Amino acid sequence: MASSREAFSMHWIPLPEDHPTPSLVVDALTVERNLTRMQQYCNEHRLNLRPHTKTHKSIRMAKRQIALGAKGLTVAKVGEAERMSQASRDLFLAYPAIGTGRLQRLEGLLRASAEESQSLGTAGRIAVGIDSLEAAERIAQTARNVGLPVGIMVDLDVGFHRTGVESSAQAVELCAWVSKQSGLEFRGLMCFPGHILPAASTEAWSQYHDAIAGVVDRLRSLGIDVPVISGGSTPTAKESHRNPILNEIRPGTYIYHDWNEVALGVAGIDDCAARVVATVVSVPTKNKFILDAGSKTLSSDRHCVEPESGFGKVVDYPDAKVSRLSEEHGEVIFPETYAGPRPKVGDRVWIIPNHICVCVNLQNSFFLYQQDNPEHGGLEELAVDARGMLV
């Protein structure tokens, strides 16, 4: 296998001298490869792909996912849905729409979808994930205000213990209630298997399957159809065939990947399409240098496998560790025994963030590198369209 420095240099080119740092640079070739591979996997296993846009937050990237065959898009918040409606009219809000402000914006989104449907002659589809009767009641009222049905996906807790109905009986009861309400359209079940890692045992996958199957069997015995059974997470995405009850997956990170995904074994360094370029602004000691990328650029998320390994991978210097972050400073250290090359003040280095989703949300824009674009050194600056959409 190529070293980190060799792998990095395969198709990335030097940046112009005046390129601003710190900044996020995304390689279009790597993005295309990542998107194509996931879509091919889904096609081969007859799974609908509904990618989560929380990673890239980009209308341009979302449109490419749809063009390659994605069924629709997943978002977390209504604000993201407002932006991503420019890329697809089939949207799933995988987050309970609780709160007056959020429900008002959902109502506005539904009205806009209705107006667009009237002008285009085709209906848009909006669904929301819930795990409580209280959430369902509020969304039902919102739907009645608009006079349009809202799709509902009931969230099951399959073991990650974040959101989701834990009890199968309660899940069946909630689904049955939703299926009888005017203003609501029961679309199916959703879950997030965040506790299942790539090396999970057959038993873990069986438990994941059984947690869903019990609810599905009971609903069908009551005459309630379950059209969609949706799972998620990039680490489990290409193992989803091990849970044959699924017919849809919602991975997000796969478009860019990050250092967490590399450590989990679901991506290689060459699959990491988004990297931060930073400038060395100080070399206070032989084994330490300071970057202009701090927590406001890289985020303070630690590594999911090795929390003490630092705040991202310095690709140019694999032995170095981003040991500490201030808002505008990234402190990088070498081991005491390190005898290799070191950067100088003014040099630029590349960092693969631990958690790319948070890193993207910290940027106003990113630079897309397209090898076949001769203008501006192949770089195009694009807005992070859904940045900061927290409502």
Question: Regions from the language model: what does each represent?
Answer:
Residues 31, 54, 84, 154, ...:
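Conserved, mostly hydrophobic/aromatic
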Residues 287-391:
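C-terminal accessory subdomain/extension
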Residues 236-315:
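Active-site loop ensemble at the mouth of alpha/beta enzyme cores that anchors a bound cofactor
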Residues 142-145, 151, 157-268:
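Active-site loop/helix belt of alpha/beta enzymes
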Residues 1-108, 382-391:
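A charged N-terminal "starter" segment
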Residues 52-199:
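Active-site-proximal beta-alpha core segment in soluble small-molecule metabolic enzymes
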